[in-house]
């Protein structure tokens, strides 16, 4: 039986889609975006449809669902999503929507179930999404095989769970193979989330990412972070000093000896992995630069691994140190509202209060996240002004922002079915 609705109300966003494409084609790539990209709810809806519903997103970590029936849930725009560990250890992802009358199946953020049971009318699903029970009153012609949960594309690599709401998402396997290699020393199946926070920022999601993609603001805003973080992006950073390059050379020799991957690996503008030293004499992103967890990750023996930085557009950045990892994900709520989730991961056998102290582990990035929240919110308030007009980026300090917006512009035009504008290459790309 075909239950798909044939009613079409048309696309009320069509005029806004055309205007969006026109603005992207004509924008100066060395300047910030026109005001509607940060303020307009219609453009936000287009962002959700063409970016967050079509690209690969990090849903969580495999260690968060270690056993059969463990699940986690998340919200992508209007779409509730369920990620669950199957009977044979597979990771499945589904729309968290019962096929009976549409109720959410799982309402908690995390949990464990034997079967997926809708709380409304107790329709019951296997962990692989098959409908097992729908009561006894659905009629003789009811075919349970037609009413399994709607699946979502899912891939795993290096302990990360990637999902896409698209039927045909962009290619990502080359990046995932590299990520798997770079994450091997961490043995992420034997990790755990020590603590997780979510903050709400009164700013457009792109402002949150733009702020992350540069450290032009760091000296004036992030005293805690700069106790350990070197501002330079990598040795190709136009600001990089010879002393920094010498430090990188010394560190890479030690990393090679321990078979720790470190080389810069890029996959277009969407993905990047690189290991960079921390400030000389520090080994972890803590207030004193000492280990945040006494028990090191995976097979790691030397805590002095700097920070392996992982970028995944549109919404994630990561710092992987010898003793713990920090995973950041950005989730748009509205045109001027964004959630930022931060997860600190340690070895699964590390004992709270013995091997690590949660307050100490999170102290640097609690402060940094709050500082970045204020910066993004003030940026948003200014952009809302009638006086706002796009301003120029520094190719020396803000090339990461330029790269992000070039990626965003190209993906938007591509997903809107428009010809992409020429993307200029800049230092650090």
Swiss-Prot record:
The residues that the entry says bind [2Fe-2S] cluster are 98, 100, 118, 121
- Highest taxon above the source species: Bacteria
Q: Which reaction does it catalyse?
A: glycine betaine + NADH + O2 + H(+) = N,N-dimethylglycine + formaldehyde + NAD(+) + H2O
Any one Gene Ontology MF annotation carried by this entry is:
iron ion binding
The answer, when asked if NAD is one of the entry's keywords, is yes
What is the induction comment? Transcriptionally regulated by GbdR. Expression is induced by growth on glycine betaine or dimethylglycine, but not by growth on pyruvate or sarcosine.
Q: Where does Fe cation bind?
A: 217, 222
Question: What Gene3D superfamilies does this protein's entry cite?
Answer: Naphthalene 1,2-dioxygenase Alpha Subunit, Chain A, domain 1, Rieske [2Fe-2S] iron-sulphur domain
Task: Write out the entry's keywords from A to Z.
Answer: 2Fe-2S, Iron, Iron-sulfur, Metal-binding, Monooxygenase, NAD, Oxidoreductase
What if the gene is knocked out?
Mutant is unable to grow on choline or glycine betaine as a sole carbon source, but it can grow on dimethylglycine. The gbcA-gbcB double mutant cannot grow on choline or glycine betaine as a sole carbon or nitrogen source, but it can grow in minimal medium with glucose or pyruvate as the sole carbon source.
Keyword check for Oxidoreductase, yes or no.
yes
**Subunit description:** The system is composed of an oxygenase subunit (GbcA) and a reductase subunit (GbcB).
* Family named by the database record: Belongs to the bacterial ring-hydroxylating dioxygenase alpha subunit family.
Q: What does this protein do?
A: Involved in degradation of glycine betaine. Part of a Rieske-type oxygenase system that catalyzes the conversion of glycine betaine (GB) to dimethylglycine (DMG). This subunit is the terminal oxygenase component of the system.
What the entry lists under PANTHER family is as follows: CHOLINE MONOOXYGENASE, CHLOROPLASTIC (PTHR43756:SF5)
User: What is the name of this protein?
Assistant: Glycine betaine monooxygenase oxygenase subunit
What species is given as this protein's source? Answer: Pseudomonas aeruginosa (strain UCBPP-PA14)
Q: What does the record give as the organism's lineage?
A: Bacteria, Pseudomonadati, Pseudomonadota, Gammaproteobacteria, Pseudomonadales
Q: Which gene encodes it?
A: gbcA
């Amino acid at each position: 039986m075909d239950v798909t609705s044939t009613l079409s109300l048309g696309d009320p966003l069509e005029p806004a889609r055309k205007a969006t494409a026109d603005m992207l084609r004509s924008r100066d790539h060395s300047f910030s975006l026109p005001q509607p990209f940060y303020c307009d709810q219609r453009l936000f809806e287009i962002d959700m449809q063409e970016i967050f519903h079509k690209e690969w997103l990090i849903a969580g970590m495999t260690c968060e669902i270690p056993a059969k029936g463990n699940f986690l849930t998340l919200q992508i725009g209007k779409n509730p999503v369920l990620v669950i560990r199957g009977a044979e250890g597979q990771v499945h992802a589904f729309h968290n929507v019962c096929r009976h009358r549409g109720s959410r199946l799982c309402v908690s953020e995390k949990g464990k179930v034997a079967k997926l049971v809708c709380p409304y009318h107790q329709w019951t699903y296997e962990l692989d999404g098959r409908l097992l029970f729908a009561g006894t009153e659905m009629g003789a012609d009811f075919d349970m095989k037609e009413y399994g949960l709607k699946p979502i594309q899912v891939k795993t690599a290096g302990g990360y769970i990637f999902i896409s709401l698209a039927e045909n998402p962009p290619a990502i396997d080359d990046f995932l193979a590299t990520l798997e290699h770079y994450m091997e020393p961490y043995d992420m199946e034997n990790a755990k989330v020590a603590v997780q926070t979510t903050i709400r920022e009164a700013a457009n999601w792109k402002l949150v990412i733009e702020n992350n993609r540069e450290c032009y603001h760091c000296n004036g805003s992030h005293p805690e972070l700069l106790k350990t973080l070197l501002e330079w992006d990598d040795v190709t950073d136009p600001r990089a000093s010879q002393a920094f390059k010498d430090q990188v050379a010394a560190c890479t020799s030690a990393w090679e000896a321990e078979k720790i991957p470190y080389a810069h690996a890029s996959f277009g503008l969407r993905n990047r992995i690189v290991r960079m030293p921390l400030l000389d004499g520090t080994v972890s992103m803590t207030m004193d630069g000492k280990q945040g967890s006494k028990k090191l990750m995976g097979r790691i023996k030397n805590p002095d691994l700097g920070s392996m930085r992982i970028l995944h557009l549109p919404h994630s950045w990561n710092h992987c140190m010898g003793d713990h990892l920090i995973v950041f994900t950005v989730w748009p709520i509205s045109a001027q509202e964004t959630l930022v989730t931060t997860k600190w991961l340690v070895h699964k056998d590390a004992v709270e209060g013995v091997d690590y102290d949660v307050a100490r582990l999170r102290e640097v990035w609690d402060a940094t996240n709050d500082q970045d929240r204020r910066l993004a919110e003030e940026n948003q308030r200014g952009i809302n002004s009638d006086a706002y007009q796009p301003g120029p980026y520094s190719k020396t300090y803000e090339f990461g922002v330029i790269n992000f917006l070039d990626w965003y512009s190209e993906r938007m035009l591509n997903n809107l079915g428009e010809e992409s504008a020429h993307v200029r290459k800049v230092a650090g790309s």
